[in-house]
Amino acid sequence: MLLFIILSVGVDAISYIQNDRSNDLCIVYEMTSFGTSFNNANDSLVKLHKHMGLKYEVCKIESNANALTQMQKCNCIYDDTPQIVVFTNFKKSSLKTLIGTENKCELLPQTTIYTPTVDIESEYFIYGNDVKICYLDKNLLGIGCDATDTTSWLDLDAGLPTNHALDIPEITSDGFKLFAKYSDSFLCQRLMDEPKKQIQFYAEVDNVPSNDVIESSRSWASVWKVVKTVLHFTYHILDLFYGNRRATARMIEHSPLG
């Protein structure tokens, strides 16, 4: 199960009744707008469900809103659905960091100096916007910052108008302080670099995002597969289950299913 905890407590189950899973596939769309192109792709999926029995859940993530909080409404990201496929046409997407790995996140208090308890053996990142940091180790980037004056702190924000993932390097036993301007910023601890589910990432041509903010320093290879449009992404979903894209695409485009 893909794990992404936000202020929750895990419970160990002693026994459970196994049920047939409800979905074969979790389809995540992150788009700058959900217009005609998305509707056409979704219509193709509806036909596929009716005539070929594919069970799926669609998760819509608006690129101009907080992706992490929107993800919490998508049951199939967290339940026993075995596969996730992700599409984005947002070049600044953080979904590879948020969905492609396992993390534990805590909400940062707004406009309050906060000193988190951290494990120096773990890796951390911020998911937010306009977040400042003051390293308490005088040998690090925060040298010269006044722990009581946030105007002297290092600004982690990259100047984007929306929330995004930001790596926190150089964690030491001295720790750091954080200051979040907005109410929907998170401090996240990396639990696993690889998810337990099968996940594939697709991006619209000319809008290919960067990789995971933590892994990017270790690998330049892109995990994003490039497609021309969101409808072409749908054809890749057909490939995933039925193998013959062209034949199935012709069925979707030309057959009067309904």
Swiss-Prot record:
Disulfide bonds: none annotated. The chain crosses the membrane at residues 1-13. Glycans are attached at N42. GO terms for cellular component: host cell rough endoplasmic reticulum membrane; membrane; T=13 icosahedral viral capsid; viral outer capsid. It comes from the Viruses. It is a single-pass membrane protein. The keyword Electron transport does not apply. It is found in: Virion; Host rough endoplasmic reticulum membrane. Keywords: Calcium, Capsid protein, Glycoprotein, Host endoplasmic reticulum, Host membrane, Membrane, Outer capsid protein, T=13 icosahedral capsid protein, Transmembrane, Transmembrane helix, Virion. InterPro entries: Rotavirus_VP7. Outer capsid protein involved in attachment and possibly entry into the host epithelial cell. It is subsequently lost, together with VP4, following virus entry into the host cell. The outer layer contains 780 copies of VP7, grouped as 260 trimers. Rotavirus attachment and entry into the host cell probably involves multiple sequential contacts between the outer capsid proteins VP4 and VP7, and the cell receptors. Belongs to the rotavirus VP7 family. Homotrimer; in the presence of calcium. Acquisition of the capsid outer layer requires a high calcium concentration inside the endoplasmic reticulum. Following cell entry, the low calcium concentration in the cytoplasm is probably responsible for the solubilization of the outer layer. This is Outer capsid glycoprotein VP7. It comes from Rotavirus X (strain RVX/Human/China/NADRV-J19/1997/GXP[X]). The lineage of its organism: Viruses, Riboviria, Orthornavirae, Duplornaviricota, Resentoviricetes.
